[in-house]
């Protein structure tokens, strides 16, 4: 079971991580616009 869990994490870890980075970058852009105003 442990190996299966690790395999699942390996498959979903990268896409989820990239998606989280996209959200953070988009949010940072919104904050920058708010600060500029």
Curated annotation (Swiss-Prot):
Residues 1-37 are annotated as: Disordered. Residues 23-37 have a biased composition (Basic residues). This is Uncharacterized immunity region protein 4. It comes from Bacillus phage phi105.
């Amino acid at each position: 079971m442990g190996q299966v869990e690790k395999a699942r994490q390996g498959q979903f870890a990268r896409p989820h991580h990239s998606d989280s980075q996209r959200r953070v970058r988009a949010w940072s852009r919104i904050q920058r616009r708010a600060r500029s105003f």
